[in-house]
């Protein structure tokens, strides 16, 4: 059973996080291992396994990139374990330049420049994210998979920039 079916939701990128959370809590109450403490060992084991599946499904579906990766996996794209890389040299050069810029900002400890950088990366991410949403809705799986790969780069860059921001604010 796929995670969307487990939560009683359509297999779609766009979903209600509130509905997902409510369904998660319902399933957790229903299958929590403590409810099976006096049950036979086989039922206890099944409850633990089902609870673990529910938790994994929750973690996967509540985060935008992992939800997109999972949806793509249902259509034959195993992005989590693949060795396929981004082949767009212009994009890769842009990433390299952005990484270098982030390093320079870190060395200069320039908070104002970092704030502008974070906004710029967020805008790049948001633009690609919107493209990915459209590609998933249109079921252009190859293009969506490529966009998800690029979003991973931007997500890591954003995380690095936010870590630098925390580091600079601690000083």
From Swiss-Prot:
This is Co-chaperone protein HscB. One of its GO terms (cellular component) is iron-sulfur cluster transfer complex. Residues 2-74 form the J domain. The keyword Zinc-finger does not apply. CDD domains: DnaJ. GO terms for biological process: [2Fe-2S] cluster assembly; protein complex oligomerization; protein folding. It comes from Klebsiella pneumoniae (strain 342). Pfam families: DnaJ (PF00226), HSCB_C (PF07743). Keywords: Chaperone.
